[in-house]
Amino acid sequence: MKFARRSFVAACFALGAALSALPLAAQTLGKDYVQINPQQPTDEPGKIEVIEFFSYGCPHCNDFNPLLTAWIAKQQGDVVVKRVPVGFNSYFAMIAPLYYTLEATGDLARLDATVFRTIHAEGNRLADAQSRSAWASKNGIDAKKFDDIYRSFTVASKVRRADQITQAYKIPGVPALAVDGKYLIEGHEFNETLAIADKLVAKVRAEKSGRK
């Protein structure tokens, strides 16, 4: 499942509980994942970097988030998971700074799921400064501090960098996972996506240790 760059209307489709994750051996280049060309640099070459491309405004990202959170908790210490908010449309671009603002205030871990719930369950899209300030205050963040950080040069720079990364990775839709700057997974059922990620993490781990 994904929110496509070229379609801002969510196309929800269910694959059904009968569809289980693909066997690891069945996951192949060009079918279950694609090779990123050119390969992208990672921030920590000694680690296995996994990037989630997402938006708080994406309904599929909302559904994927708890599964990804559980998956992250199971990873070994050599895996580093990072997240990049995309700006595929005006709404996504408008709320992209929210991720980096919460990161700066130290409230990201506490309020990440709350943002998704606010937008998708409560119907508050946080689409204007007033609603975002009220939301921040309601959730224990000083509204002025929140607003100042949201509009800061630092956050704007991080959002620009996120846009550059999204373009470099040629992300067609969200949610999407990139593994170590080499492999991209998108457009699959969520459990299938994570099963493919497991396979690719193991592949990269073997490559880094000199095994085939």
Predicted features and spans:
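Structural microenvironment flanking redox-active thiols in thiol-disulfide oxidoreductases
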Residues: 74-105, 110-136
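Solvent-exposed, acidic/flexible segments
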Residues: 46-47, 57-65, 88-95, 104-108, ...
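C-terminal cap of thioredoxin/glutaredoxin-like
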Residues: 55, 138-212
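Extracytoplasmic thiol/disulfide redox context detector
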Residues: 2-90, 163, 167, 205-212
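Glycine-rich, flexible loop/turn motifs
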Residues: 29-32, 122, 146
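Sec/Tat-exported extracytoplasmic proteins
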Residues: 57, 68, 72-75, 102-106, ...
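Extracytoplasmic/secreted envelope proteins and their assembly/folding machinery
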Residues: 65-72, 95-99, 112, 129, ...
